[in-house]
């Protein structure tokens, strides 16, 4: 890969690093579906509540719902559930949205979001994740007398 980088790209990257001090690089993962979409899996208290596809608008590659993506139901599979729950545990999240991509090698976690919107899963599946969050909070309240 480094051999395919142009000298002008290296110069540009150096300028960006000098100006900003930090650069995050991310491996490109080709979508197995051929269409620009990802999966948002909602995990509460170690359990997968449900998952949606976030489909990019026509002609776009960004599938974020706030940027015009459209939520559709995503079937729960053992692989999806296992990876989403393990990803949530890896960062110590009680409630999160785990973003995954379908690649030729299977599912890949790309992000664990600690403040995901529940609108997409509600719109696509009718699941209100706030109920599961409230149940978790209530079951973990300290019931000692003051």
Model-derived regions, located:
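Active-site lining segments that contact anionic ligands and/or coordinate catalytic metals
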Residues: 36-38, 95, 107
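C-terminal active-site "lid" helix and adjoining low-complexity regulatory extension at the edge
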Residues: 75, 89-90, 102-146
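Protein kinase-like catalytic core scaffold
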Residues: 24, 49-50, 96, 108-111
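A short glycine-rich, hydrophobically flanked beta-strand micro-motif that places a catalytic Asp/Glu
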Residues: 26-27, 93-104
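Gly/Ser/Thr-rich helix-start
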Residues: 47, 98, 127
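Phosphate-binding site of ATP-dependent enzymes
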Residues: 2-87
